[in-house]
Regions:
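TOPRIM metal-binding catalytic domain and adjacent DNA-binding surface shared by DnaG-type primases
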Residues: 1-58, 173-176
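Short coil/turn linker and secondary-structure boundary residues
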Residues: 13-16, 130, 146-149
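Short, aromatic/basic amphipathic alpha-helical patches
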Residues: 20, 152-168
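Generic structural hydrophobic/aromatic packing signal, biased to beta-strands
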Residues: 21, 60-62, 144-146
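A structural signal for short, well-ordered beta-strand segments and their strand-loop junctions
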Residues: 30, 144-146, 167-168
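Phosphate-handling DNA/RNA-contact segment within nucleic-acid enzymes
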Residues: 45-141
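Short hydrophobic/aromatic-enriched beta-strand-loop microsegments
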Residues: 124-130, 162-169
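Acidic beta-strand-to-loop metal/phosphate-binding motif
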Residues: 137-159
């Protein structure tokens, strides 16, 4: 996995896990593609990152190849974390894909990984501690469709982190 963190033992979801997701309306392909959902046991460490722990809680794991990271979701609590802290959003590789915006489609931003899975991973779930990076990561998206519950968070964070200091240069005027 990531060089900065210890390897995390991953397993396939149990049949009970799969049945639970199916009852919640999640399509089997959404659990398997583009990369299969896996299961890890661990906890959130003091630095806010996932730490493998055999006596910890069960977390569903999603590999984020473009960030060389892995997102962990604890379904019972709804908590999200990652292995190295490099990932911006669950499913973030879709942000820069042309097909995301073709035929007047929009980038979907979901409030919860279950909604994301029910939509067959057609969008992203922004990591809770990564919303301040939203402006830099999403400003070039032509269209965004966002969960209503996220609208205040989106509006608060879709501003540049800082603006340059501005100086006004007086124009020279000539006599007529």
């Amino acid at each position: 996995m990531m060089a900065s963190r210890p390897d995390c033992p991953l397993a396939c979801p149990s049949q009970a896990d799969l049945d639970s997701f199916r009852r919640a309306g999640v399509d089997v392909l959404a659990m398997a593609t583009p990369a299969a959902m896996q299961v890890a046991t661990g906890r959130i460490a003091h630095d806010g990152l996932f730490e493998p722990d055999g006596s910890g809680q069960r977390w569903f794991a999603f590999r984020e190849e473009d960030a060389d990271d892995m997102v962990f979701w604890q379904r019972q609590t709804g908590r999200l974390t990652s292995c190295s802290g490099r990932v911006f959003a669950l499913g973030q590789e879709i942000i820069n894909e042309t097909a995301t915006y073709s035929f007047d489609c929009a980038l979907n931003i979901f409030a919860d990984p279950m909604d994301w899975l029910n939509a067959r991973r057609d969008g992203i779930v922004v990591m809770p501690n990564r919303w301040p990076a939203a402006f830099d990561r999403l400003r070039d998206c032509p269209r965004i469709a966002i969960a209503e519950s996220l609208l205040p968070t989106y509006r608060r964070n879709m501003t540049p982190g800082r603006m340059p200091e501005l100086y006004i240069t007086p124009e020279r005027r000539t006599a007529a």
